[in-house]
Amino acid sequence: MNNSNIDNAGWSFDNTYSKLPKSFLSITSPTPVKSPELIVLNDDLVNELGLNFSKISKKNLSELFSGNLLPEGSKAIAQAYAGHQFGHFTMLGDGRAVLIGEHVSKSNERYDIQFKGSGKTPFSRNGDGRAALGPMLREYIISEAMHALNIPTTRSLAVVKTGENVVRENVLNGAILTRVASSHLRVGTFQYIAARQNEDELKTLVSYTIDRHYPNIKKSKNQALDLIEVLMQKQIDLVINWMRVGFIHGVMNTDNMTISGETIDYGPCAFMDIYDPKTIFSSIDQLGRYAYFNQPNITKWNLARFAECLISLIDKNKDKAIEMATEIINSFEKNYEIKWLNMMRDKLGLFGEDTKDQILILDLLNWMHKNKADYTNTFCYLMDEKIKSDPIYKSENFILWKKRWEVRLKINNNTPEKYFKLMRSVNPLVIPRNHKVEEALEGANNENLTQLNKLITILKKPYQNQKSMMDYQSPGSINGKKYQTFCGT
C-alpha cells in the first residue's frame, strides 16, 4: 500500500520521551487489524495540528488511524506508570495504548499522538489490549465537548472500527481511538519511577517534566517543591472547571491525573442533570469515592501522593522535606475555596466580593438539591427565562432567592450587559446529556451515525443559542433506571 500521502500529510515528529531511560517505556507496535473503517475524523483538530489529509483516501486514513500504517518519523512505545486505583497502589503502564510519537505543529506546540485500543503491550497483564466502539466514541464525544467548554483536556482526533470483535460481558465492535495530549505524563508516572528508588531516574523525570510543561520554574532553587505548587494550582483550576459544568470524572485514580493539568480518561464519566452533590455514575464506585462533591478532596489526596514521590529531591533532611511539601498540600483548601467562590460568582454574574456571597450561593445550591432542579438549566433560566423555563422556578422560595440575587447584581457598578456577558461565558446552554450520548452510541453500534454526528455538532458551541439545541437541553432517563457508566476496559 502506498504510504507517501500519509507521510506527506504534514507530520513533524520529535520523539523526546522515547529517549528517556529504558525503564520509562517499552518499545512496541500496534497490532494490525483486519478491516479498519474510519467512523469519525476531527477536521477541526486536524487543522489545529497543521495536518492535511485532503489527498488521502478514506481507506488509507482507516489504515493510518488503526495503526496498520504508521507515518514516517513515528516511534511507537508504551509508557510505564503506576497508580492508586480506588486508593490501592498498583504497577500499571499502557496496557492497551501505544504512543506513536510527539508531533510538533507549525506554531511549535508539542502533541502526543496515541492509539488507544491498539493491541497488547508488555504492560497488558491479562488484558487483550483492545477497546470497544462505544467507549472510544464516548471519549471522542465528551473530550471534544470538554474542549468546547474551555476545560483543559486531551483531545480526540479519530475513531476507527477494527473489523474485529472484542469480548467483554457481550461481544462488541472493536475500535481504536486516536488521542492527542500535551503529554501523557501522570502522577502515576512519578509513582512508578519513585517506586524504583533510583534517584537519578527521578531527577531525569523532574527535569523532563519542567522542560516540557513548566520551563518558568527551570531556574528555581527548589524545582521539586515548585513543581508540587504549580501542579496543585493547575489541578485546582481543572477540578473547579469540572464543578462549574457538573462533570463527574468517575475514576480519579492517580494514573488519571496528568502533570499538564488536562482531563484524561473518559471511561465512566458523565454530566450531572439533577443537582445532587453525592451524584455518582460509575458502576464500580459503590462507596462514592469519586462522587461530584468529593472530587476536590480526591484531587488533594492525589497531589499528596505526587508530593511523596519528590521528598528525596526537596531536601536531604527527610523530615524537613516532608514539612515543606505538607505546607503546600495543606494550602489546597484555602486556594480551592477562593477559586470556587470566584467561579460561582461568575456563574451568577457577580462582580467584586460581598460578605454574603457564599450564603447566597449555598442557598441556591441547597434549593436546587431539595427541589431536584437541573443544575445546567437553572443557570440557563437565570440568564434568560425564555431559554429554559420550568414550573419549578415559580416556587416561592426560588422567587425570594432570586430577589436577593437581583439586589446583589447591582453592586460594583454592575449592568445587565456586563453580568449577562459574564454568565454566558461560563454557563453552557448544552452539555453532553447522558441519554443523548447513549442514543448516539447505540446508533453507531448499529451503523447509524446520524445521532452521533448531530450530537458532536451541537456540542461544538455550548455557549451559543442554537436553533436545534432545545432537544439537547432536557434531562432524560435511561428506560426509567438510574444512569450508570462503565469503564470500558
Regions found by a protein language model. Name each.
Residues M1-N5, T16-L20, R96-G101, K161-V166, ...:
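Short, mixed-charge, low-aromatic patches
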Residues M1-Y81, F86, F281, Q286-T489:
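Regulatory N- and C-terminal appendages and interdomain linkers associated
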Residues S29-P30, D128-R130, L225-D226:
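Short, contiguous strand/loop micro-motifs
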Residues S35-L38, D43-L61, S66-S220, I259-E262, ...:
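Conserved ATP-binding subdomain of kinase catalytic cores across diverse folds
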Residues P135-M136, N165-H249, S260-N366:
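ATP-dependent phospho-/nucleotidyl transfer catalytic cores
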Residues V251-M252, M257:
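Hydrophobic HxD+1 residue recognition
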